[in-house]
Curated annotation (Swiss-Prot):
Belongs to the bacterial ribosomal protein bL21 family. This is Large ribosomal subunit protein bL21. GO terms for molecular function: rRNA binding; structural constituent of ribosome. GO terms for biological process: translation. One of its GO terms (cellular component) is ribosome. InterPro entries: bL21-like, bL21-like_sf, Ribosomal_bL21, Ribosomal_bL21_CS. Keywords: Ribonucleoprotein, Ribosomal protein, RNA-binding, rRNA-binding. Part of the 50S ribosomal subunit. Contacts protein L20. This protein binds to 23S rRNA in the presence of protein L20. PROSITE patterns: RIBOSOMAL_L21.
Length: 102
């Protein structure tokens, strides 16, 4: 069984036991998170939400918080001696999906 959830402005396909990386949540490591915005549940009985599936939840355990690899943002204007170099590391939360309840 799998489900499509919405979190952090993104839609993510999840299955039980899967590790996922999502936008940072304000939750301590080791706690359990419940997602109520379940858009789709697939498997033997398919349920499509409009926009969400009523009564469906996905529970996951927070494994750790971290920051992604650094990306370099370099802005440049030709012939104007205008250069700006900036780095960015996006924070994330690593989850392990425990159960899909539909």
């Amino acid at each position: 069984m799998y489900a499509i959830i919405e979190t952090g402005g993104k839609q993510i396909k999840v299955e039980a036991g899967q590790e996922i990386y999502i936008e940072k949540l304000d939750v301590e490591a080791g706690e359990t998170v419940t997602f109520d915005k379940v858009l789709f549940v697939g498997g033997e009985n398919v349920k499509v939400g409009s926009p969400v599936v009523e009564g469906a939840t996905v529970t996951a355990k927070v494994e750790k918080h971290g920051r992604a690899k650094k990306i370099i943002v370099f802005k440049y204007k030709a012939k104007k001696n205008n250069r700006k170099k900036q780095g960015h590391r996006q924070p994330y939360t690593k989850l392990v999906v425990e159960a899909i309840n539909a």
